[in-house]
């Protein structure tokens, strides 16, 4: 839209055009009062994206303030591109998770691909080299053609971008549930490594210093992407394909290498990715954080389309772009580095001392706004919150153990449920070995990468069981953090910190805001108990389709430190004769379980209980046993319960089986989802030492070499007798089989 066609100040107000950009009447009146005049079209657009939920967290700030964000090893908490945690030896790990839900529902390949690209830029803009990508994906039931299409395209988009840029995708999770039918979730996490002296911040310091634009040219793609991500899906959403950006991983690879070289040059003052809200957010946020202002001449912005207006340039979310602040007079040093990588680097403005964002276009001042008003002074809403009617009903509903006539058949069916089934079809499309640092590939409890030149390694995971959160968001929030930590510990690592992605429905509905509040309470309590501070994250609200919300899905990304690569542990049984232990007692808890969903087609009842002090004690005892060389394998018990965890531990073991005798109330208890449990194997000579070290561990059987999975009760009655290769075939074949089948 050219300047000549843009609505006047008066039209914007009288025709309430600001509402189309996502601003309310009250917000527009507040803008008028802050700047002392009516904003023009460009300024209205700038305020609308900066004050969107996606950029300002205006609905979620009161909830986010509950999270513990400080810790002994935290070098950078929330507020920058990514969080940073010290791991010793002058090194730190940098990580962050972000959502690209709305774009992925409309244009799944590009939506997922650019989600990966954006989170990688967040990490390298801190000065870190990205070493791994993970993801957390949610889709509807894998029986409808639409869901199959979204699933295949999202995975292809993640693979296409990650593989081209040369960063391994080492882990993640994929869940399928009716609640995501119209609104899939695509959360991407990136982990990077950095030396302390290389840490950079997104700040525009030093009056007179040069503001430099680097990377791809600006086009019209992604305009109002941040606003689009702050509203519910409707039939009109399909028309917003232009709000989905297009990614170029080869450009990103060049940008990554060039930026990491530039970061070593002391001419660089500040650097930030142009992510949500593009040029607008990067310039306003960098200036606001530094207590300065920025003036830019938009005629100098590299453009790939003709006749772009100031509004379009400032709101574009074209990918692979960075904004830098360079020491005045040293611009050529930086330009030379980017030219070496065949990248455009252009001086487009300078830092000022008046705390204003001033934009010139075609000889006119087209924007003059206070940066703090944009970046810090969005209204904060304390939304009404009310407990949904179903919650009390669930608390008071007794869930009986499902009647099971054939436990072997039930186990096989559970292994074929898409949420439990092997995700090999997914991760086989990812290059998870590129750069050759991957020690534990996708498919175990966590991805593990060694840190070259040291004995250390990093374990990483994403976790969330949204069914528990639907039943009880506070308990479910605790479980999400605890399960992530369990996965880290099972890999031989000490949990360090959390990055969270809060995916919820429309916060303007009191029962949805209640879910957000309660889950944050649960997450906060678990993070405090387990000493895993929240160092950053993302909020994605308005995940609704035709008025129906997704299950509350606060995904927990967690990273842990393996002190010695000799401690790295996987879920797979290692050798015949090893003794199998289960840590933790099993209760009859079926609400929200995979078994309940499979047998009854719905979930209801009281969520499984969790005692965080017990959880911590078991995790610490298991980690100490691993570090003391007592453990052969370790696997957390999650979806599908003990039966599934034990069976999974036999898969991929080249002929091993298991002979289990266990004291449980019923066959159904094999599939109960009681929390804080682990399946562990130890060598026979370590049996007594392990039992003494881990108080809640009970011996339940032996690893065999006959390739048979056998489970008996205490009386010796056989519940399951099945060939491991048959179970594994069912588990591995489930997703490919569903994708091929006609709905």
Curated annotation (Swiss-Prot):
Mg(2+) 1 binds at residues 98, 538. It catalyses: N(2)-formyl-N(1)-(5-phospho-beta-D-ribosyl)glycinamide + L-glutamine + ATP + H2O = 2-formamido-N(1)-(5-O-phospho-beta-D-ribosyl)acetamidine + L-glutamate + ADP + phosphate + H(+). GO terms for biological process: 'de novo' IMP biosynthetic process. Its main location: cytoplasm. Substrate binds at residues 99-102, 121, 245, 317-319, 540. Monomer. Part of the FGAM synthase complex composed of 1 PurL, 1 PurQ and 2 PurS subunits. Belongs to the FGAMS family. This is Phosphoribosylformylglycinamidine synthase subunit PurL.
């Amino acid at each position: 839209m050219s300047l000549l066609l843009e609505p006047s100040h008066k039209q914007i107000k009288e025709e309430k055009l600001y509402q189309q950009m996502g601003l309310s009447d009250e917000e527009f009146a507040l803008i008028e009062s802050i700047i002392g005049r009516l904003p023009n079209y460009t300024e209205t657009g700038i305020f609308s994206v900066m004050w969107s939920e996606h950029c300002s967290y205006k609905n979620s700030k009161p909830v986010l303030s509950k999270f513990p964000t400080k810790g002994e090893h935290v070098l950078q908490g929330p507020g920058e591109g990514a969080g940073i945690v010290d791991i010793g030896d002058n090194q730190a790990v940098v990580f962050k998770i972000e959502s690209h839900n709305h774009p992925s529902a409309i244009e799944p390949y590009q939506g997922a691909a650019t989600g990966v690209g954006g989170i990688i830029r967040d990490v390298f803009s801190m000065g870190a080299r990205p070493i791994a990508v993970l993801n957390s994906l949610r889709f509807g039931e894998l029986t409808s053609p639409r869901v199959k299409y979204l699933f295949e395209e999202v995975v292809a988009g993640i693979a296409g971008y990650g593989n081209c840029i040369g960063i391994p995708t080492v882990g993640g999770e994929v869940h399928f549930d009716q609640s995501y039918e119209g609104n899939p979730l695509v959360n991407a996490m990136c982990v990077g490594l950095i030396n302390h002296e290389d840490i950079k911040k997104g700040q525009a310091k030093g009056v007179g210093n040069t503001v430099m634009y680097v990377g791809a040219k600006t086009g019209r793609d992604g305009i109002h992407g941040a606003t689009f991500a702050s509203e519910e899906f409707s039939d009109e959403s399909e028309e917003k394909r232009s709000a989905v950006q297009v990614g170029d991983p080869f450009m990103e690879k060049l940008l990554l290498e060039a930026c990491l070289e530039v970061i070593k040059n002391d001419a660089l003052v500040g650097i930030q990715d142009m992510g949500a809200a593009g040029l607008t957010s990067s310039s306003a946020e960098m200036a606001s954080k530094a207590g300065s202002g920025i003036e830019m001449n938009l005629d100098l912005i590299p453009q790939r389309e003709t006749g772009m207006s100031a509004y379009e340039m400032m709101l574009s979310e074209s990918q692979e772009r960075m904004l830098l602040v360079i020491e005045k007079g040293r611009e050529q040093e930086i330009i030379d580095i980017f030219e070496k990588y065949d990248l455009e680097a252009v001086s487009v403005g300078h830092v000022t001392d008046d705390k204003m964002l001033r934009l010139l276009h075609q000889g006119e001042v087209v924007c003059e706004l206070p940066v703090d008003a944009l970046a810090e002074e969005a209204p904060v809403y304390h939304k009404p919150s009310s407990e949904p009617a179903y919650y009390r009903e669930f608390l008071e509903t007794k869930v009986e153990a499902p009647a099971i006539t054939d436990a072997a058949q039930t186990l096989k069916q559970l292994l074929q449920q898409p949420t439990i089934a092997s995700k090999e079809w997914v991760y086989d499309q990812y290059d998870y070995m590129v750069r050759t640092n991957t020690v534990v590939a996708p498919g175990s409890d966590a991805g593990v990468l060694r840190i070259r030149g040291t004995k250390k390694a990093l374990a990483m995971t994403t976790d969330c069981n949204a069914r528990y959160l639907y039943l009880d968001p506070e308990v479910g929030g605790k479980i999400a953090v605890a399960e992530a930590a369990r996965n880290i510990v099972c890999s031989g690592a000490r949990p360090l910190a959390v990055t969270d992605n809060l995916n919820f429905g429309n916060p303007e509905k009191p029962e949805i805001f209640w879910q957000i509040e309660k889950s944050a309470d649960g997450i906060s309590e678990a993070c405090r108990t387990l000493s895993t501070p929240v160092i950053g994250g993302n909020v994605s609200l308005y995940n609704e389709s035709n008025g129906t919300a997704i299950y509350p899905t606060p995904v927990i990304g967690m990273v842990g430190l393996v002190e010695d690569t000799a401690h790295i542990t996987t879920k797979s049984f290692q050798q015949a004769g090893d003794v199998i232990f289960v840590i933790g007692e099993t209760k009859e808890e079926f609400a929200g379980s995979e078994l309940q969903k499979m047998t009854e087609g719905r979930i209801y009842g009281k969520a499984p209980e969790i005692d965080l002090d017990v959880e911590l004690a078991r995790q610490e005892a298991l980690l100490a046993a691993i570090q003391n060389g007592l453990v052969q394998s370790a696997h957390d018990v999650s979806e599908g319960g003990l039966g599934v965890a034990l069976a999974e531990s036999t898969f991929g073991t080249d002929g091993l089986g298991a002979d289990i005798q266990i004291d449980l109330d019923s066959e159904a208890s094999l599939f109960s989802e009681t929390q804080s449990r682990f399946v562990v194997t130890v060598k026979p000579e370590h049996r007594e030492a392990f039992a003494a070290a881990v108080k809640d561990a009970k011996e339940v059987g032996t690893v065999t070499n006959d390739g048979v999975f056998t489970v008996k009760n205490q009386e010796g009655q056989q519940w399951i007798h099945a060939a491991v290769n048959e179970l594994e075939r069912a588990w591995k074949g489930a997703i490919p089989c569903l994708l091929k089948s006609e709905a």
